[in-house]
């Protein structure tokens, strides 16, 4: 086995663990110990990172440090299978930064279909300069339901360490997304067990 990308938080531990095992034996062991689990990978999810830097929206434009963070991030280190648009000419034609910010369903859906993604998240980072201090905030939208699924409080940042702060935001969102996937599927399993008991 190997363990990578370990993350420790209050009452939560996550890591990418690669193991060779007999699935049925492991599942039986977890059941015997009363440990809830879900063993499938999450859906392929298109990440569309936009940065609003002092009221200038940047998606495909260069530089987009928020897009660059996701490009450098190991996309396979999470339960959800994150993918990024390549930024080719047809991507630019399909979806502009304004379209993404306005959550234009059909344009987002078309881009997601191109990348064979079953989900699409618009990750908007706002960077504001207020009284010579920079503030950063992330708001994540589900591109299909148009709902806010994740947000952070406005925090002070320093432009010299902006990349570090953006990296933390990416990690926080990825952890949230993984936890949500596990919770939703544990809920489904528990409902199925309840229904079977009722029958």
Regions found by a protein language model. Name each.
Residues 1, 82-124, 132:
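Short, solvent-exposed, polar/charged sequence segments at loop or secondary-structure edges
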